[in-house]
């Protein structure tokens, strides 16, 4: 087989479809978020405004977080020197896990090197260890959840997105004595919609199923202490396992799962993606711990973000931009064509110093291409006006029509 030819063909097909991804080299500037320096191919840099960061609350540059990280590096060095089982567990890990368990009202928590790994480890392990397990997965679940379920080898049932009635139908078709897991998200990252957690728990509880809730795009952002949508809706006690990330609203890196102590012990003891990897660096755990503690006690960042989300959404819709009225902080601007989406992103960056990464297949379905806008507490009204004016200008230049979106 001509391996080189095969690989070249795959890349050329991606480029022809408008799906080829390029890296944009950015240098974040401490204390100046959401501004960053864009480094061009010629080595020159210029200042741009970032509108697609997952550092939702700017905690990646918060003084408390940075101070904790600097202190940890000075005291403990860079890495841990081992896995959690072999010399790689430290005080920062233990305190962070206790803080996360408290955040969600659970008995215990377990941290991982990323949110992707935490889903892979937890779902992959639990589904594998439960004999004849059936896993029920929302149709729009994240890739990490899909891969974890696939890796478990358990039989998978896909229920229509956010459709508790369809979930009930599927669960009724399975023998009641089989172990069952219902896996879903609270805030869906591409559409910005929110799951009916209580209704899904109603169905799961009726069948005696484990509920597994991914709160990656909600922790830190929702609830009186940043415990996510489940905390905000008062249903966290009904969810068996809550998974989250330390790399978005908390601004650092890593992932975690919180739940019953027995299940945490099972994952810790049987998940190869936990057992056989070096543990999270002490300064990352220390920074995440500072972020979690700050957001538990201080709602100011959340309040400012919500003000900005509402303000920008109103401005975009007043300009007839195709932004659905989502209930979350995520504002998808629907383009519906891969090439136009990519070119829109390029022109925003080239002509207006605004960076929003295009979202194309396979992250979203063909025909659902979009720009994913994430306002933060630190975007100003001037930033918003510049963004709306730039989008109006780019739309006029490219001639893309405004797709119909939900009111």
Show which residues each predicted segment covers:
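N-terminal "arm"/small-domain region of PLP-dependent enzymes with the aminotransferase-like
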Residues: 2-6, 10-76, 209
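Active-site phosphate-binding strand-loop segment of PLP-dependent enzymes
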Residues: 55, 157, 161-213
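PLP-dependent enzyme catalytic core of the Aspartate aminotransferase-like
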Residues: 56-59, 63, 67-71, 75, ...
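Short loop-beta-helix segment that forms the pyridoxal 5′-phosphate
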Residues: 82-87, 97-121
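Conserved PLP-anchoring active-site segment centered on the Schiff-base-forming lysine
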Residues: 123-143
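Active-site C-terminal subdomain of aminotransferase-like
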Residues: 207-210, 217, 222-327, 339-340
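Conserved PLP-binding catalytic core of the aspartate aminotransferase-like
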Residues: 302-312, 317-353, 361-363, 367-368, ...
């Amino acid at each position: 087989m001509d391996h080189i030819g095969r690989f070249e063909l795959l890349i050329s097909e991606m480029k022809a479809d408008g799906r080829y991804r390029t890296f944009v080299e950015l240098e974040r500037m401490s204390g100046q978020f959401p501004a960053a320096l864009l480094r061009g191919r010629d080595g020159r840099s210029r200042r741009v405004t970032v509108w697609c960061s997952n550092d939702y609350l700017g905690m990646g540059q918060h003084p408390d977080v940075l101070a904790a990280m600097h202190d940890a590096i000075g005291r403990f060095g860079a890495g841990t020197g081992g896995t959690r089982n072999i010399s790689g567990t430290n005080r920062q890990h233990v305190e962070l896990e206790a803080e996360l368990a408290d955040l969600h009202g659970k008995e215990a928590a377990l941290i991982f090197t990323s949110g992707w790994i935490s889903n892979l480890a937890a779902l992959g392990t639990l589904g594998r260890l439960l004999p004849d397990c059936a896993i029920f997965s929302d149709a729009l679940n994240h890739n990490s959840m899909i891969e974890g379920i696939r890796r478990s080898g358990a039989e998978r049932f896909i229920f229509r997105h956010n459709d508790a009635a369809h979930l009930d139908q599927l669960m009724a078709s399975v023998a009641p004595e089989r172990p069952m897991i219902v896996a879903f998200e609270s805030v869906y990252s591409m559409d910005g919609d929110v799951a009916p957690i209580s209704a899904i728990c109603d169905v799961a509880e009726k069948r005696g199923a484990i509920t597994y809730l991914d709160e990656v795009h909600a922790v830190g952002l929702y609830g009186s202490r940043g415990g996510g949508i489940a905390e905000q809706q008062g249903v966290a006690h009904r969810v068996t396992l809550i998974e989250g990330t330390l790399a978005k609203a908390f601004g650092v890196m890593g992932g975690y799962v919180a739940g019953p102590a027995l299940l945490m012990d099972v994952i810790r003891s049987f998940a190869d993606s936990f057992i056989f990897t070096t543990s999270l660096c002490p300064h990352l755990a220390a920074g995440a711990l500072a972020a979690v503690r700050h957001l538990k006690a201080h709602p100011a960042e959340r309040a400012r973000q919500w003000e900005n989300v509402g303000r920008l959404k109103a401005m975009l819709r007043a300009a007839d931009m195709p932004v659905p009225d989502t209930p979350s902080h995520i504002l998808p601007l629907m383009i519906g064509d891969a090439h136009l989406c990519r070119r829109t992103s390029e022109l925003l960056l080239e002509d207006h110093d605004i960076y929003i990464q295009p979202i194309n297949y396979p992250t979203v379905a063909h025909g659902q291409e979009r720009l994913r806008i994430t306002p933060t507490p630190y975007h100003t009204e001037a930033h918003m006006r510049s963004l709306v004016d730039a989008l109006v200008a780019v739309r006029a230049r490219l001639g893309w029509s405004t797709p119909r979106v939900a009111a």
